Every structure is written in C-alpha cells, then in structure tokens.
Amino acid sequence: MKINTLILILYSFVFFLYSQKLLAKYEITDPPECFNNKGETVKFQNMKSKTGKITIGIAKKDALGKPIIYRFNYDKSSKFLQKFIDYHECAHHQAGDLEKINLPLNSKDYLLREDMADCIATIRMKSNHLNAKNSILNTLKELKKAMKYIGFDELGIKRREDNILKCFNKNVSLKNFMEDIVKQKNIEK
C-alpha cells in the first residue's frame, strides 16, 4: 500500500512538472532588424493562437504587399528559439523567396529554400551572440522537440539538425554569405 501511494505521488509530481513545462510562459523578445531583398523594412507582428502549443513564424506580404513576419505564440519558447525563428523568416525576405512562386511542400526546391533560410539564421545567430554555440544548441533542442510535436519524422529532424550544425561550422561572415547567395540567384535567372 505504501509503495503504491509513493508511486502515485511520484507519478503525480512528474506529471505536474511536465504540465508546468507545457504551460510555461516566456518573455517575448524584440524582433531583429530585417530588410527584404529590395531594401524594404520588414515589419513583425505578434499573434496569439489559443490552441497553439508551439512557436511559429511566417514570412508573408501583408494586404498592401509590404513585407511582414507573423510571430505566433512566441511566449511558448525561449529567447533562443524566438531569435532563430525571426532570423529564419527574415532570411526568406532577404533572399527574395516571397517574390517567387510558391513551391510544393517538401519538393527539392522547397527544402533547399528552407535549408538556406536555416543557414542564414544560424550564421546570423552565430555572429550576433557571444555564446553562440550554447545559443544554437539550446535552439536545436527546442526546435527538435517542436518538430517532433507537429509530426516530423526522425529523418527530417536529423536532416535539419545536420544542416544547422554544418552552417554553424562555416567560417564565413553573414555579409559574405548573403553576397554569395545573391550572386548565385543572379546566375540562376
């Protein structure tokens, strides 16, 4: 009887801790400076979803055709993941991805676009944070958990993690990396 009671108490305590983690609220960070490929300032708008359990960013054009990033449920993640998502979505504007046709989800070109945005975000995070390695590792930990939560398979999660780590280990400045991307995109035209 005492053992059953002890197990029940421990189980309840673990469940309580886990539920508190899901309910955790974080301070929403200020968005970074962001300009699109045309030099226009990208605006950020915080949004809340009552049912949303994870942080999501979406790069779009608003009703007037101006560049914007919608920041959903940023209070659900740490500053590391918030910054990474902001940088990733900003990268889509910087690279001119919104000027192109929408690509089929999970097509080769779509995945290359996402890899590039992750790479730009990683290099930007690396150049803007004193303890960059810790920032990236914390980001990856949260990002992998969120990806698993929304249904990504292990292979997709591992692929993204490997790309982010590969980009982190690049010895290149953000400015030079962006210049290379612009040159590459001009060649592809």
Question: What are the residue ranges of the model-derived segments?
Answer:
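Classical Sec-dependent N-terminal signal peptides that target proteins to the secretory pathway
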Residues: 1-24
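Auxiliary, metal-adjacent structural segments of Zn-dependent hydrolase domains
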Residues: 20-64
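Sequence contexts marking disulfide-bonded cysteines in secreted/extracellular proteins
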Residues: 33-35, 118, 166-168
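Active-site scaffold of zinc-dependent metalloenzymes
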Residues: 45-79, 90-99
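Soluble non-cytosolic domains of exported or imported proteins
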Residues: 76-81, 85, 107-115
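Sec-exported extracytoplasmic/periplasmic mature domains
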Residues: 91-99, 118-130
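Post-HEXXH active-site segment of zinc metalloproteases
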Residues: 96-118
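Long, well-structured alpha-helical subdomains associated
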Residues: 127-189
